[in-house]
Amino acid sequence: MLVLTRKPGEKIMIGDDIVITVMEGRGDGVRIGIEAPRGVTIQRSEVVEAIAAANVAASQAGPETEELLKSILPPAG
């Protein structure tokens, strides 16, 4: 991991097309701005981890969940 020290207003380049700007420091947090092409997905790691955990939980649903869904949804076909 590369660790850099930057002041508000200073920038970090990632490749040729991603720019991270330090906006301001707030207490024990930092506000940053990210400029990237539209095709680049930018997510906070805690959101990605929460979605992954929810997907795992959903994939492990028991038979009672299947029966509940069958009673709610119309028959296929």
UniProtKB/Swiss-Prot annotation:
Keyword Cytoplasm listed: yes
Q: Which UniProt keywords apply?
A: Bacterial flagellum biogenesis, Cytoplasm, Repressor, RNA-binding, Translation regulation
A single GO molecular-function term is:
mRNA 5'-UTR binding
Biological process (GO) annotations held by this record are: bacterial-type flagellum organization; mRNA catabolic process; negative regulation of translational initiation; regulation of bacterial-type flagellum assembly; regulation of carbohydrate metabolic process
> Which InterPro entries has this protein been placed in?
CsrA, CsrA_sf
Q: Which SUPFAM superfamilies does this UniProt record tie to the protein?
A: CsrA-like (SSF117130)
Which Pfam families does UniProt cross-reference here? CsrA
| Coiled-coil residue spans | none
Query: Where is it localised?
Result: Cytoplasm
Any keyword Nucleotidyltransferase? no
Supply the Gene3D superfamilies for this chain.
Answer: Translational regulator CsrA
Gene Ontology cellular-component terms for this entry are: cytosol
Q: Its family?
A: Belongs to the CsrA/RsmA family.
Function field: A translational regulator that binds mRNA to regulate translation initiation and/or mRNA stability. Usually binds in the 5'-UTR at or near the Shine-Dalgarno sequence preventing ribosome-binding, thus repressing translation. Its main target seems to be the major flagellin gene, while its function is anatagonized by FliW.
Q: Partners and quaternary state?
A: Homodimer; the beta-strands of each monomer intercalate to form a hydrophobic core, while the alpha-helices form wings that extend away from the core.
Q: Which PANTHER family match?
A: CARBON STORAGE REGULATOR
Q: What is this protein called?
A: Translational regulator CsrA
Gene transcribed to yield this protein: csrA
